[in-house]
């Protein structure tokens, strides 16, 4: 789960990470009051969307005049902000953060991530802050400092010293960085965050470290024990089909292809997407109905897939173990009849009660194409949408 910048800063400040004074505006009519309330000579007006690169699209403005700041915020509200991360469709601005401008001497980068490949938490830092860190990692990887931390021992002074030394920080700045790293580590562990980025982490003219921008991602599977974090969810920022799938307890990721996929098991789902690509087409989604799906969940899965206007055909690939193929067939029929499905549908069933499942589908009056195996299923659906 992603959250907005102002929410990330709110969390970080609770762990004593320094931030600039700011006010989040959640209603258009609160703009004037918020700007009047912020004691500063220079206002920074920031669009709040779940995407980076906001400045490029006009989502960050600076003003030394209070009235101008109000007009900038009002013009920003409701705009369709297009950035390199939103894609051409952009994202509608429905929240704004007004912040006091900082006097910057230097911009750094600091991040921490759950590093599954190395089974640890990895801190990353760079003197090239304020810009796209992925681009820095690609063009100048030597600029990225990495420190791996064993989750059993936690962050230790020598971890901080490595980053502090390589960044060239001394004296009070070194102490500040050590405190911020310790705070970020504690926050990541305590909130079930998977990624924390402070970019830039600035050094001010009076040698103070301040988190000028922040991004935090959280583990969706752990939200049940993080009610405060869950309360920060902004459903307007999420894909409506992915949100609908989450509420139905379905693992669904929307993609850019035109062949919808319904599969049980993540590994089988990825194999299904791979073979669709092998036949020259593109999957429209990843959807795992899980091993214990019932008729209702299967029906909802088909409705979600068919709600994507890019989908021109659907491939259902089920290997029945715990899940029975006849349950899948009944759910598919119920949903197909309810939504009056009119696009090609290819179904491959194998495993528990697959004969009964095939019989249920074949006895229906719907135009459903049966497949003998995965290769046959992929070939048939690609041919059907070509």
Curated annotation (Swiss-Prot):
Record InterPro entries: ATP-grasp_succ-CoA_synth-type, ATP_grasp_subdomain_1, Succ-CoA_synthase_bsu_CS, SUCC_ACL_C, Succ_CoA_ligase-like_bsu, Succinyl-CoA_synth-like
Query: What are the annotated GO cellular component locations?
Result: cytosol; succinate-CoA ligase complex
User: Where along the chain is substrate bound?
Assistant: 264, 321-323
Q: Which residues make up the binding site for Mg(2+)?
A: 199, 213
GO biological-process terms attached to the record: succinyl-CoA metabolic process; tricarboxylic acid cycle
The protein's UniProt keywords, in alphabetical order, are: ATP-binding, Ligase, Magnesium, Metal-binding, Nucleotide-binding, Tricarboxylic acid cycle
Q: What is its EC number?
A: 6.2.1.5
The residues the record assigns to binding ATP are 46, 99, 102, 107
EC supergroup of this enzyme: ligase
Q: In which pathway does it act?
A: Carbohydrate metabolism; tricarboxylic acid cycle; succinate from succinyl-CoA (ligase route): step 1/1
User: How is the cofactor bound, as the UniProt entry phrases it?
Assistant: Binds 1 Mg(2+) ion per subunit.
> Catalyzes what?
succinate + ATP + CoA = succinyl-CoA + ADP + phosphate; GTP + succinate + CoA = succinyl-CoA + GDP + phosphate
Q: What are the recorded GO MF terms, alphabetically? A: ATP binding; magnesium ion binding; succinate-CoA ligase (ADP-forming) activity; succinate-CoA ligase (GDP-forming) activity
> Needs which cofactor?
Mg(2+)
| SUPFAM superfamilies noted in UniProt | Glutathione synthetase ATP-binding domain-like, Succinyl-CoA synthetase domains
Keyword DNA-binding attributed: no
Q: What is the protein's known function?
A: Succinyl-CoA synthetase functions in the citric acid cycle (TCA), coupling the hydrolysis of succinyl-CoA to the synthesis of either ATP or GTP and thus represents the only step of substrate-level phosphorylation in the TCA. The beta subunit provides nucleotide specificity of the enzyme and binds the substrate succinate, while the binding sites for coenzyme A and phosphate are found in the alpha subunit.
- Per the similarity annotation, which family is this? Belongs to the succinate/malate CoA ligase beta subunit family.
**HAMAP family in alphabetical order:** Succ_CoA_beta (MF_00558)
Assembly and binders? Heterotetramer of two alpha and two beta subunits.
Stated name of the protein = Succinate--CoA ligase [ADP-forming] subunit beta
């Amino acid at each position: 789960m992603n959250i907005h910048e102002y929410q990330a800063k709110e969390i970080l400040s609770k762990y004593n990470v320094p931030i600039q004074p700011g006010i989040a505006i959640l209603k258009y009519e609160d703009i004037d009051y918020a700007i009047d309330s912020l004691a500063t000579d220079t206002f920074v007006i920031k669009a709040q969307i779940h995407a980076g690169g906001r400045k490029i699209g006009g989502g960050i403005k600076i003003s030394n005049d209070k009235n101008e700041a109000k007009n900038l915020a009002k013009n920003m509200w409701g705009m369709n902000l297009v950035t390199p991360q939103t894609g051409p469709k952009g994202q509608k601005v429905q929240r704004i953060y007004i912040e006091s401008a900082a006097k910057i001497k230097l911009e750094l980068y600091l991040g921490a991530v759950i590093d599954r490949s190395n089974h640890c938490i990895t801190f990353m830092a760079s003197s090239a802050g304020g810009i796209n860190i992925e681009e820095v990692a690609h063009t100048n990887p030597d600029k990225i400092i990495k420190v791996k931390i064993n989750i059993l021992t936690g962050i230790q002074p020598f971890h901080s010293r490595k980053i502090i030394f390589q960044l060239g920080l001394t004296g009070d700045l070194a102490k500040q960085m050590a405190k911020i790293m310790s705070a970020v580590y504690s926050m990541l562990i305590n909130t079930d965050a998977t990624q924390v980025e402070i970019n830039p982490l600035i050094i001010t003219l009076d040698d103070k470290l301040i988190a000028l921008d922040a991004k935090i991602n959280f583990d969706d599977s752990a939200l049940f024990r993080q009610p405060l974090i869950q309360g920060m969810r902004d459903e307007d920022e999420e894909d409506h089909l992915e949100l609908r799938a989450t509420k139905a307890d379905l693992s669904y990721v929307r993609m850019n292809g035109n062949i919808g996929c319904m599969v049980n098991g993540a590994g089988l789902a990825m194999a299904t997407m791979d073979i669709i690509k092998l036949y020259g087409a593109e999957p429209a989604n990843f959807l795992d109905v899980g091993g214990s799906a019932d008729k209702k969940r299967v029906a909802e899965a088909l409705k979600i897939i068919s709600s994507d206007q890019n989908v021109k055909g659907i491939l259902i690939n089920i290997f029945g173990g715990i899940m029975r193929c006849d349950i899948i067939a009944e759910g598919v029929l119920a949903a197909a009849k309810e939504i009056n499905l009119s696009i090609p549908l290819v179904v491959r069933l194998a495993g528990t009660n697959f004969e009964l499942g095939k019989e249920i589908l074949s006895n229906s009056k719907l135009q459903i194409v049966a497949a003998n195996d995965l290769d046959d299923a992929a070939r048939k659906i690609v041919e059907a949408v070509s």
